[in-house]
Every structure is written in C-alpha cells, then in structure tokens.
C-alpha cells in the first residue's frame, strides 16, 4: 500500500488548522488583503494546469474579490465545511488504499467502501474490532454529510447500528468537529497497519 497520500493528508490537516487558528485569533485583521492573497495563491502550484483546458483562456485575478460573509462571524460554519472536505478526502484515500490491499491479497469485495472494510477485517485480529467499527463509522459519516444533506437516514444508520448505542435517529442532524478527524485517522492507520501484517505473511 502507498502511505504517501495519508501522510500528505495529515500535513494538509495540520497546515489548515494552523492557518485558521491564527487567522481566528487575529480576528481576520487583514481580511481586506483577500484579493492579493488570492493572487499570491495563484503561484502556489505551477504549472496551473498540465493539459489543454479551454479554461486557461479565461482571465484570472482581474476582478476585485472580497469576503461576502464576514469570516469572523461565520468561522464556525467555515470550520465545519473544512472538516467536511477533509473527511471526504480521507475516505477517498482510505478507499484507494483498501483497493490496493484487496488486490495484493487476491480478495474481492463489493464496490462500497464498507464492503471492503468487512472483507479486509477477515484478516485482522479481533482485538482491533474498534478500528473496523471506527472505519465503518467514518464511511457512514461521510455519506451523511455528502449524500443526505447532513441528516442520518436508514441507509447510513444501518452501517453503524451494530456498535453505536443508541444509534442515530432518521432525520437527526449530524455535526462533526476537528478532533474527530484525528480519531478517524488513527482508526484508518490502525486498521490498514493490521491489514499490512496479513499482507506480509500471505
């Protein structure tokens, strides 16, 4: 398995938390500099695009940009959006790494990430059932946030009802804070490390 994506994700997590906390503590005192920050950001990744996108003909940076919503008063909502984006990316990385493991173990599983978790758990010691459950929870949470408007439904509840007591109720709104990203990362790393042990002896 290629661990670089999850290591890169961790570095991104730290960088975003660091930047947001300093901006929050400073009450976004330089928010008028947003436009110049965007122009500087345009040079962060070069080349900007490595294929012949028609969008490259579009002008960039000519229009003055400013915050439409005050970042101080909307910090909580912005933080929740950041958590959502990072959580989505973590699930994508986890899914790709599970696919790599399944191939190396000559296993087959369903298309959904939870099916891959269940299949790979067959080679993981039962001591780490907590990691399996946490990985399933991560997938369910991603589905709630991205596919059901932030509210639990019967399908997402079915993923966690075996170990979340009491289980969420249909229509109940989900909220996830930054500490959960660290907990889910620990679960993913633990689960995949245990799978890796099985791969080494297979």
Name the predicted role of every residue range.
Residues 98-140, 147-148:
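Short non-catalytic regulatory patches outside canonical folded cores
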Residues 1-88, 96, 129-141, 157-202:
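Extended intrinsically disordered or low-complexity regions, especially N/C-terminal cytosolic tails and loops
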Residues 106-123, 154-172:
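Short, charged amphipathic alpha-helical segments flanked by flexible coils
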Residues 94-109, 146-149, 153-156, 192-202:
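Long, hydrophobic, amphipathic alpha-helical segments used as structural scaffolds
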């Amino acid at each position: 398995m290629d661990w670089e994506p999850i290591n890169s994700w961790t570095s991104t997590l730290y960088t975003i938390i660091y930047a947001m906390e300093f901006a929050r503590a400073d009450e976004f005192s330089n928010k008028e500099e947003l436009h110049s920050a965007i122009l500087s950001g345009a040079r962060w990744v070069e080349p900007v695009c490595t294929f012949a996108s028609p969008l490259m003909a579009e002008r960039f940076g000519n229009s003055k940009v400013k915050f439409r919503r005050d970042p101080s008063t909307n910090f909580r909502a912005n933080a929740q959006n950041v958590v959502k984006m990072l959580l989505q990316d973590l699930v994508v990385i986890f899914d790709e790494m599970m696919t790599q493991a399944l191939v190396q173990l000559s296993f087959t599983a369903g298309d959904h990430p939870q099916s891959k978790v269940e299949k790979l758990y067959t080679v993981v010691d039962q001591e780490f059932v907590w990691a399996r459950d946490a990985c399933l929870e991560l997938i369910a949470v991603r589905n709630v946030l991205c596919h059901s408007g932030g509210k639990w439904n019967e399908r997402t509840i079915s993923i966690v009802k075996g170990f979340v007591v009491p289980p969420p109720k249909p229509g109940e709104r989900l909220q996830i804070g930054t500490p959960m990203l660290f907990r889910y990362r620990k679960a993913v790393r633990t689960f995949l490390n245990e799978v890796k042990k099985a791969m080494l002896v297979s």
